[in-house]
C-alpha cells in the first residue's frame, strides 16, 4: 500500500499542518508518495519541509518515498532555480519531468535550498548570503545598512541550532517575496528545518524536571524561545535566539518555531497568528521561520 | 609590551578557507585555542586582538572567542580589542554583558579605548578618567571625579579585577593600546 500525501496548493507555514497530518502515525508504515502535482506555490518553509520529510523517512529506514513534481511548468522552473530538485533527488524517487536548474537562481532567492550538516556549512551559508542580503534588505526592505550583518548573524545562529541540537542534518533557504494578503509589503523569509530530535528531546534531560507534568513540545519551545535555555550547561549558551528576538522586535519581524506537535511564535502587530499552538499533527525535528518585513516610512 | 594578534589570519588557519566571518562555536573555540597558544609563547602581558579583516562576528563566536578568553586568561593577560566595527561591538557587548565581563576596545583612528560589556557605572566612569588622564592613584581619581576615596578605591578595584587597568604601586595605568 502507498500513503499519498498531497502538498497543499499554496504551501507555507499556514498550510504546513495539513501536510504534516497526511503522514498519520510517524513514521508511516506504508510507502509514501508526496504529491505536488497541484501545487501552485511553495514558500522556502514549504520546500524544505518536503525535504525534511524525505530525510526523516530515510533515517527511519523506510522505503524511498516518491515525489510527483508540480504540473505547472512555471512552478517547476521556480523550484528548480531555488535548488529544490537537486536536493530532493537524493531523498525521493522523482516522478515527472524536472527542468534543469539554471546557473543562477531568481533574484529574490537569496539562498538556494542548502543542506546544513556541519559548522563548515554555516560558514558557506553566511559567506553566500552576504552579497544578496544587502541588496534586498537595504535596497528593497529599507532596513538600515547594519541590518545586513544582524540578518547574517540571525541566519548563522538559526543554522547552528541544527548542527548543535538536531543530531542530524537539515536545510536552510532564504527568499524575498511579497506578503500580499497578510501584510501588503515585501518580506525576507529565512526558513530552517531539520529532521532531528526536536526541542523536547534536546532539552529534556536538563529542563523537563522543573516543568513537571507540563513538559512537552510546547513547554520545550517556551523554554528555548522565551526563557533562552539551552541543553548545555555552558552559561554562554542560549543567547542566539535571545538576540534574534531583540532585533526582530526592532524591525517588527516574526519568528515561529514548530517542533513535534507544537508551534510557538513571537507575533508582531501586523500578523494575526496565535502565539502558541499545541496538539498539532506530529512532524519530525524542528522548523524555524523568521520573517523580516519592509520598513514603513514612519519607522525609517 | 603588546602582542598584536590578527584575527583574520587565525580564522583562515582555523577553517582552512578564505572566509572572513567569525561564525560558529567550533570555529570560535579553534581560534581561541590558537590565541591561547600564541600568548603562551610570548613574554607580553597585553594581547591586542585585531579584528580589522573580519567581516562578521556572530554571538556564538563572540562567546567562544572573547568571553571565554577573558574567563580563561583572567589572571594572566590584559586583552584589548581593535579594528571592531559597530556590529562587532554589538555582538561582543551582548555576550560580555551576559557573563558580566568587560573588555577595552580601541575605535578606529583612536587610542582612547571604550568599554564593551558590563561593569558598574562608577567603574565605567573611572575607566574613562584613567584612559584620558593617564596613571592615577586613588586620591587622584577622587580629585578628578569629585568622589570619596572609598568610592574611587572601589571603582579602581573593580577595574583591576576585570583587568581593565594595570595597577603598579599606588598607581593605576591605562591599558597600552599602541
Language-model region placement:
Chain B
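Domain-start "cap" segments at the beginnings of catalytic or binding domains
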Residues: 1-24
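Short helix-capping/hinge SLiMs at alpha-helix to coil transitions
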Residues: 40-41, 130-134
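Short alpha-helical segments that sit at the start of domains
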Residues: 98-129, 154
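Short, cationic-aromatic polyanion-contact patches
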Residues: 119-120, 167-178
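Short acidic, hydrophobic short linear motifs in intrinsically disordered regions
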Residues: 132-145
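Short amphipathic alpha-helical interaction segments
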Residues: 146-161
Amino acid at each position: 500500500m502507498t500513503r499519498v500525501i498531497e502538498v497543499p496548493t499554496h504551501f507555507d507555514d499556514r498550510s504546513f499542518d495539513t501536510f504534516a497530518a497526511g503522514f498519520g502515525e510517524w513514521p508511516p508504515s506504508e510507502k509514501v508518495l508526496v504529491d505536488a502535482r497541484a501545487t501552485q506555490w511553495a514558500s522556502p518553509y514549504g520546500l524544505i519541509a518536503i525535504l525534511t520529510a524525505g530525510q526523516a523517512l530515510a533515517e527511519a529506514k523506510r522505503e524511498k518515498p516518491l515525489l510527483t513534481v508540480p504540473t505547472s511548468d512555471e512552478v517547476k522552473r521556480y523550484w528548480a532555480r531555488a535548488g529544490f530538485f537537486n536536493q530532493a533527488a537524493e531523498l525521493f524517487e522523482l516522478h515527472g519531468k524536472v527542468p534543469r536548474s539554471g546557473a543562477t537562481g531568481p533574484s529574490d532567492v537569496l539562498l538556494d535550498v542548502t543542506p546544513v550538516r556541519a559548522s563548515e556549512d554555516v560558514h558557506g551559508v553566511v559567506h553566500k548570503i552576504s552579497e544578496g542580503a544587502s541588496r534586498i534588505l537595504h535596497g528593497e526592505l529599507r532596513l538600515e545598512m547594519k541590518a545586513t550583518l544582524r540578518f547574517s548573524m540571525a541566519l548563522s545562529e538559526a543554522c547552528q541550532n541544527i548542527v548543535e541540537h538536531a543530531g542530524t542534518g537539515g536545510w536552510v533557504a532564504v527568499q524575498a517575496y511579497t506578503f500580499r494578503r497578510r501584510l501588503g509589503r515585501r518580506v525576507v523569509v529565512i526558513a530552517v528545518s531539520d529532521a532531528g530530535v526536536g526541542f523536547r528531546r534536546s532539552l529534556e534531560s536538563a529542563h523537563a524536571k522543573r516543568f513537571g507534568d507540563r513538559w512537552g513540545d510546547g513547554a520545550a519551545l517556551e523554554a528555548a524561545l522565551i526563557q533562552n535555555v539551552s541543553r548545555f550547561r555552558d552559561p554562554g549558551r542560549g543567547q542566539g535566539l535571545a538576540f534574534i528576538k531583540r532585533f526582530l522586535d526592532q524591525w517588527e519581524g516574526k519568528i515561529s518555531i514548530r517542533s513535534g506537535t507544537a508551534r510557538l511564535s513571537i507575533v508582531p502587530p501586523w500578523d494575526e497568528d496565535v502565539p502558541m499552538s499545541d496538539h498539532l499533527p506530529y512532524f519530525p525535528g524542528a522548523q524555524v521561520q523568521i520573517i523580516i518585513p519592509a520598513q514603513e516610512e514612519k519607522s525609517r | 609590551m603588546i602582542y598584536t594578534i590578527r584575527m583574520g589570519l587565525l580564522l583562515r588557519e582555523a577553517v582552512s578557507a578564505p572566509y572572513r566571518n567569525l561564525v560558529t562555536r567550533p570555529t570560535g573555540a579553534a581560534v581561541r585555542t590558537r590565541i591561547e597558544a600564541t600568548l603562551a609563547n610570548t613574554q607580553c602581558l597585553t594581547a591586542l586582538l585585531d579584528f580589522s579583516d573580519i567581516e562578521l562576528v556572530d554571538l556564538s563566536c563572540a562567546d567562544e572567542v572573547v568571553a571565554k578568553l577573558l574567563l580563561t586568561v583572567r589572571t594572566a593577560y590584559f586583552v584589548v580589542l581593535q579594528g571592531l566595527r559597530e556590529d562587532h561591538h554589538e555582538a561582543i557587548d551582548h555576550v560580555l554583558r551576559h557573563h558580566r565581563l568587560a573588555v577595552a576596545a580601541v575605535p578606529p583612528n583612536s587610542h582612547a579605548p571604550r568599554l564593551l560589556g558590563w561593569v558598574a557605572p562608577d567603574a565605567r566612569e573611572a575607566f574613562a578618567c584613567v584612559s584620558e588622564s593617564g596613571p592615577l592613584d586613588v586620591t587622584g581619581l577622587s580629585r578628578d571625579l569629585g568622589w570619596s576615596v572609598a568610592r574611587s578605591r572601589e571603582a579602581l578595584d573593580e577595574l583591576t579585577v576585570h583587568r581593565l587597568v594595570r595597577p603598579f604601586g599606588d598607581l593605576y595605568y591605562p591599558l597600552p593600546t599602541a
